[in-house]
C-alpha cells in the first residue's frame, strides 16, 4: 500500500501488478474499482496487470468487457475470519 493503491506487486522498483479490493460486487463498487485501476495505472510507464478483487462472481459478459480494458477479476470469500482467494496463483 502506498497511500493510493490498495495493494501492489513490484520488482526492481517497478510496479508490476495493481490490486483494487472491494467488499462488495455492487455496481457502485465496480465503477469505483474500474476508475481507480485505470487512473492509478496512468503514471506507470511499464506494462502493469490490473486486478479487481471482489467477493461475488461477476456475470461472464461483465468479465469479458473488463478484460477488454485489461482488468482481471480475483474472487475471495471468508472462511473462519480469513480471506481465501480463488485463482490467485494464476494471476501472479
Q: Would you name each region that the model predicts?
A:
Residues 25-36:
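Active-site-adjacent loop/helix micro-motif of nuclease/hydrolase catalytic cores
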Residues 25, 57, 80:
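Residue-level detector of flexible, active-site-proximal loop/helix-junction positions
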Residues 70-89:
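A glycine-rich helix N-cap at a beta->alpha junction
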Residues 43-71:
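Nucleic-acid nuclease catalytic cores
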Residues 1-2:
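A short acidic/basic microdomain associated with nuclease active sites
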Residues 7-9, 13-26:
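Conserved catalytic cores of phosphodiester-cleaving nucleases, focusing on short active-site segments
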Residues 20-22, 52-54, 76:
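Conserved beta-strand segments of the P-loop GTPase G domain that flank and frequently precede/overlap
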Amino acid at each position: 500500500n502506498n497511500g493510493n493503491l490498495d495493494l501492489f506487486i513490484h520488482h526492481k522498483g517497478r510496479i508490476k501488478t495493481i490490486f483494487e479490493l472491494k467488499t462488495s460486487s455492487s455496481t457502485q463498487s465496480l465503477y469505483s474499482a474500474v476508475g481507480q485501476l485505470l487512473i492509478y495505472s496512468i503514471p506507470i510507464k511499464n506494462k502493469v496487470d490490473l486486478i479487481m478483487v471482489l467477493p461475488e462472481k461477476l456475470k461472464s459478459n461483465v468479465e469479458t468487457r473488463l478484460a477488454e480494458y485489461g482488468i482481471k477479476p480475483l474472487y475471495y470469500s471468508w472462511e473462519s475470519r480469513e480471506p481465501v482467494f480463488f485463482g490467485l496463483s494464476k494471476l501472479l
